[in-house]
Design a protein with these regions (language model features):
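Short acidic-glycine-tyrosine-enriched beta hairpin
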Residues: 82-99, 198-214
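A short hydrophobic beta-strand segment most commonly corresponding to one strand
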Residues: 106-122, 160, 165, 211, ...
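Glycine- and acidic-residue-biased ligand/ion/polar-headgroup-sensing regions
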Residues: 67-82, 181-198
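Asparagine-centered strand-capping/turn motif at beta-strand->loop junctions
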Residues: 102-106, 220-223
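A short, N-terminal "cap"/entry segment at the start of jelly-roll beta-barrel domains
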Residues: 1-49, 107-160
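Structural motif
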Residues: 78, 99, 109, 185, ...
Length: 240
């Protein structure tokens, strides 16, 4: 292992946000994992109402079961979900306690989000579904063609979460500082930029993770020569 340079890191922890950078990652298997390890990013221990981690699989590795709903997005490699193959950019949503087997066909990495499902009276819980990010038509954010959003979860009140990818052309930014009741888990997939979190401004790049608590002032602007892109979770469709 290479020794760290005098304890310096871009990573930071505040009461209402976390920037976790790859140099700070600690890997450990979670219960039920076989041939796989996890980098836990957000969890109830930090105050989050969901858990998000990166799962790193050897060929044949599997995830354990969970009583929560689960969203899996393939970052690299190939995952088999009950025999169906998901490649990079593919994803699956699983209802609570779903028995589906998630297995790596080759060495793979995936973003995993787990959250207790909050039901709505009279509306049944959705069934498992799969998708591919590139098959979705992007939508400009507030009519800005330089910021494109793909919604990976259907617009259906049965779902209590939203997961999107957002792509920013170099120099593009969010049009406002957002302050809202939803919390976020965000994985930087590509590029770099500046993220405002509260009264702190952080350089961020591909591989970073950000947790944002409710009502945290937040803003992002893309820098560099290529588009910046991230995967972002929020709680949705339920009373606070």
């Amino acid at each position: 292992m290479t020794m760290h340079r005098f304890g310096q890191t871009r990573g930071a922890r505040r009461c209402d946000h976390l920037l976790q950078t790859p140099d700070t990652f600690v890997r450990a298997p979670l219960p039920g994992m076989k041939g796989a390890t996890a980098i836990v990013h957000a969890a109830p221990a930090i105050g989050a109402k969901f858990t998000q981690y990166t799962a790193e699989f050897e060929a044949g590795g599997t995830l354990g079961s969970t009583e929560a709903q689960r969203f899996v997005y393939v970052l690299e490699g190939q995952l088999e979900i009950d025999g169906d193959l998901l490649e990079s950019g593919g994803y699956v949503w699983l209802p609570p306690a779903a028995p589906a087997l998630i297995r790596a066909a080759i060495r793979s990495r995936a973003a995993v989000i787990e959250k207790p499902y909050v039901a709505l009276a009279g509306i049944p819980c959705p069934t498992m579904f799969r998708g591919t990010e590139t098959a979705l038509t992007p939508t400009p954010l507030f009519s800005d063609p330089d910021v494109q959003v793909r919604s990976l979860i259907p617009s259906d009140p049965a779902f209590d979460l939203a997961v999107n990818t957002m792509t920013f052309q170099p120099g593009a930014s969010l049009p406002m500082v957002e302050i809202h009741v939803m919390e976020h888990g965000l994985s930087m997939l590509q590029g770099n930029g500046i993220y405002r979190l509260g009264d702190h401004w952080y350089p961020v790049e591909a591989g970073d993770f950000i947790w944002m608590a409710p009502y945290l002032p937040q803003w992002f602007g893309a820098l560099g020569k290529k588009p910046a892109r991230y995967l972002i979770f929020k709680d949705w469709n339920r009373l606070p």
